[in-house]
Structures are given as C-alpha cells and as structure tokens.
Amino acid sequence: KYLSFFSWVLFISFAAAEDNRCYELRVYTANEGKLDALNARFRDHTCKLFEKHGFTNVGYWTPAEKSDNRLIYVISSPNRKSHNESFKSFLNDPDWKNAYRASIKNGKLVAKIESTFLKTTDYSPKIESTITKNPRIFELRTYVTANDRLDNLNARFRDHTCKIFENHGMKNVAYWTPTDENKGSANTLIYIISHKNQNQAKNNWKGFISDEAWKKARAASVKDGKILASAPKNVFLK
C-alpha cells in the first residue's frame, strides 16, 4: 500500500505489457522511537516531492512485527538514468532541504538506508495504484538460488507457482530481479504477494505446500539439482 495513511494499495492486472521501468527497493531503518516521525516526513513532504521530480510512488509499507522499525518502499522511473537525475534534483530541492532540517531538530530519523535497483520479471503482474477499502497484509519474499539456477526458479514461478498461489488465496503483486551484480542480479528473486490477513496467510501457505500440483512441480524442477541456495527470507508488511 502507498503508506497506510493514504489508503492506497497496489492493483494487479494480468494483461500486462512488458514493463521496462527502473524500480528501486529502499529500506530505511529508523532510529529508536523515530519511525512515526519518518512516516510523517514521507506523508507530508517526501512522497509529493518524489512525484514533483519524476518518480512514481509504487508502494510504502512497515513490517507487521511492531518491534521492526523499518520503512520499506518501492519507487520507479522510466529508466536508470532518469532515476538518478530525479534523485539529484530531489536532494537539491529547497523544499526537501527545509523539510529534512525541520524533521531532525530532535535527532536524526534514519540509522541505515539500503537500496536495490530492480527490473520486473516477464511474468510479473502489471503494477498500478488504486484506492481500496479492504486492507491487506503483504509479504515480501527474497529467494537466492544456487549457481546458474535463477532461470529455473523463474520458470517454476512462471509455469506453476504463481497460478498455485492464486488457487490458495495469495495475490501476486510484483516480481523482480536485481539489476546490479553486487545485489544479486544472477541469483536473486524478490517478490511481493498479499493475503487477506496474517492469520489467513498461514492457512494459505499450508494449503499451498500440501497442494499436489505444487509437489509435482517442485519435484520436477529439482530433478537436475536444487534450485535454492538457502531458505527464502520473508517479512509481513502492512
């Protein structure tokens, strides 16, 4: 969703044309007690200034786990060059400088920033924004493959996993791979799905794992060797 106080969420269309946009996943770890102030800065200033300088606000979330003090968001631009130019103009905007100075009068808000540039996979749903009255729980998942197995993982999602997710109440939101080698371009899949709520997510996964179609697809996909190098990482988001 596009920050909870805006009540916007990602809207999925499966009639998606090829998406060549540059996406950036940014993770801000707030200093202790500063997450609310960080959200306020985005709500009142940053999101609007991003749009002013050519960014598209794709989605903003905070972890469902209350002890996790991160803000996780995705923005996009037509391409990497324009993305970098937009950030430069954003940082030089007097309105941003004023908002930033005002926000840190009582201490800096952010302890750490992580950034990953992304491109959509050929099976990712189209990513748009719409307004909804029904909040959802989102799940951000990261898979790291064994050597030379990313194509196999993508094939399994394209041909089987995404469809089976839908059969078990999971909505496919977006699928990406990193564009930079040092961020895992050769072995990493990052995706977002959604559930009605976190309790339902447990049931959705239980149904998926026990699905015979999934068991067959997984068994066939690993006949010539394992696909994943390690267990997937996930975080529930709201």
Set out the residue ranges of the language-model regions.
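Hydrophobic h-region of N-terminal signal peptides that target proteins for export
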Residues: 8-17
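Short S/T/G/P-rich N-terminal loop/turn motif that feeds into the first structured element of a domain
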Residues: 16-98, 102-215, 220-238
